[in-house]
């Protein structure tokens, strides 16, 4: 039987009648001293401090407000610089206390895969859950704990178990790679349609976008597609500056804080870089978040573009990163509102034209799981690094003869994605298989989307 000796701990601060904030601060100091004095073994001051800070931020119940250790601050810096070692996923986790989504499972969820990375190549999608990392359940892990395990030296592997549609479970041993986060890609579709892909909003993204728009202007494009799918956001100011390239007046976004003097309204300032006669389609999905939603709403609410795709992620809060010596923290210090004065946090922005690839049937889901578990696509491409159309068709027929139930179009896309990744030759856009892009092009050319 354990022997428990009860000591009475009465903080002097209770007798002093201090205000609550200062009172709790003094209690914290006294608690630290009490533990260090009476705990049977030696106690590490830094470990106590970090534990207390993490508990403080956890008590807020906001997944975007977190205490960050020195290592986590370094990782955040690597991400901001656009390069780190990992698998290539933006992830999130909501506390059960927040009540964000009753149907949401208590695991880390993929916000979006980063293009041209190991996770992207394997077909990981926005909305997939990460239920295990290296065999350990993520249910009780913090977001940072999961991220820390997934990151590592390029060339090493991490085992990740995913859950899709709440009934497809699959595990990959993923080789970590040097993850570079490109923010802008651009090209022409059919010579007169500009295609602008923004994958995230870094500090230098506006310069890259301006360069692409200047090139489009020289080519005298008639239409423009801005693709913000699987864009997790980034720097608020970058989204505002880019919105200004398309608007000559009107509100871009407003930010409201607890401190009234911090409230700001950002207006367009006549820095338009593309002709107002060019109709614009903006592609969005549930992986479009934060700054991507700001740009989408700014263009849509001001009548400059039509949104096509799926309802966005729904992150309408603004965080600031602050340092505490070598440690630091990220705190939600405001919420942003669209030009129509709507905060889309936990709601998202619906498209004006809903388009998405159809969901897989139960039979197709089972076939997809089988392909993943048996690495069939990867093995085929390893044996046929540059397969001909005939070889791909023959492979597809072989899969079907073995009981794989899936459209030829989907199987062909899986093969081509693997080939492109292995050859480091991913196309800027995919008009053959991308049904959302196909619809955007159709609507632009038919005149359903008009310049405003």
What are these regions (language model features)?
Residues 1-224, 230-232, 394-452:
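Flexible, low-complexity junctional segments that flank or bridge functional domains
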Residues 185-225, 229-452:
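C-terminal "post-core" interaction segments
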């Amino acid at each position: 039987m354990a022997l428990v000796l009860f000591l009475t701990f009465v903080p002097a601060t209770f007798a002093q009648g201090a205000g609550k904030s200062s009172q709790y601060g003094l209690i914290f100091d006294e608690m630290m001293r009490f533990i260090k004095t009476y705990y049977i073994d030696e106690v590490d001051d830094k470990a106590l401090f970090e534990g207390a800070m993490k508990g403080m931020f956890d008590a807020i119940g906001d997944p975007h407000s977190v205490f960050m250790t020195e290592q986590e601050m370094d990782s955040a810096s690597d991400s901001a610089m656009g390069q780190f070692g990992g698998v290539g996923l933006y992830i999130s986790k909501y506390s059960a206390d927040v009540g964000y989504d009753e149907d949401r499972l208590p695991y880390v969820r993929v916000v979006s895969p980063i293009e041209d990375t190991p996770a992207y190549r394997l077909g990981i999608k926005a909305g997939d859950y990460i239920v295990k990392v290296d065999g350990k359940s993520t249910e009780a892990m913090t977001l940072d704990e999961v991220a820390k395990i997934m990151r590592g030296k390029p060339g090493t592997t991490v085992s990740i178990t995913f859950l899709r549609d709440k009934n497809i479970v699959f595990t990959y041993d993923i080789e970590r790679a040097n993850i570079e986060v490109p923010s802008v890609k651009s090209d022409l579709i059919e010579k007169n349609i500009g295609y602008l892909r923004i994958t995230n909003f870094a500090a230098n993204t506006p310069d890259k976008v301006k360069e692409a728009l200047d090139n489009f202007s020289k080519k005298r494009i008639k239409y423009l597609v801005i693709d913000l799918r699987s864009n997790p956001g980034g720097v608020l100011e970058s989204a505002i500056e880019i919105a200004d390239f398309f608007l000559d007046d009107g509100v871009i976004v407003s930010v409201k804080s607890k401190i009234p003097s911090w409230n700001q309204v950002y207006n367009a300032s006549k820095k338009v870089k593309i002709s107002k006669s060019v109709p614009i389609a903006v592609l969005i999905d549930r992986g479009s978040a934060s700054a991507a939603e700001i740009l989408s709403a700014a263009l849509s609410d001001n009548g400059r573009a039509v949104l096509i795709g799926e309802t966005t992620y729904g992150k309408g809060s603004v965080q600031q990163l602050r340092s505490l010596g070598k440690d630091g923290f990220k705190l939600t210090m405001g919420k942003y509102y669209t030009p129509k004065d709507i905060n889309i946090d936990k709601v998202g922005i619906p498209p004006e034209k809903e388009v998405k690839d159809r969901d897989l049937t139960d039979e197709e889901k089972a076939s997809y799981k089988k392909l993943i578990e048996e690495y069939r696509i990867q093995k085929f491409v390893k044996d046929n690094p540059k397969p001909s159309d005939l070889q791909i068709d023959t492979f597809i027929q072989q899969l079907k003869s073995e009981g794989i139930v899936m459209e030829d179009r989907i199987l062909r896309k899986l093969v081509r994605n693997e080939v492109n990744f292995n050859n480091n030759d991913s196309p800027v856009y995919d008009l053959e298989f991308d049904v959302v892009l196909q619809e955007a092009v159709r609507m632009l050319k038919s005149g359903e989307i008009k310049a405003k």
